[in-house]
């Protein structure tokens, strides 16, 4: 569990709607970024994985580094793990 004020996730850009876990985060644990509680984790999230900071509608875009990275394939609740099981490449995106 996170100590009061101790960050367990990072956000790379102010427009991001996901945080990245810097250590494993347990279901029900506060997701803390720069000493500010953002959401409660809806499920266990491993280090390096994304956590939704707000609800993301099906078809909504996930932003990291202020850039669109994937599209939600289903509604993703605040605090949920964001990964390949609930996202896909943005239609029309071409990989370099």
PLM regions: where:
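N-terminal small-residue-enriched
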Residues: 2-96
């Amino acid at each position: 569990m996170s100590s009061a004020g101790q960050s367990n996730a990072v956000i790379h850009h102010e427009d991001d709607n996901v945080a990245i876990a810097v250590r494993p985060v347990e279901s029900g644990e506060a997701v803390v970024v720069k000493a500010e509680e953002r959401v409660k984790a809806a499920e266990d999230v491993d280090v390096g994985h994304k956590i939704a900071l707000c609800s993301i509608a099906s078809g909504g875009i996930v932003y990291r580094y202020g850039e669109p990275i994937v599209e939600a394939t289903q509604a993703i609740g605040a605090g949920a793990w964001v990964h390949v099981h609930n996202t896909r490449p943005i239609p029309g995106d071409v990989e370099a």
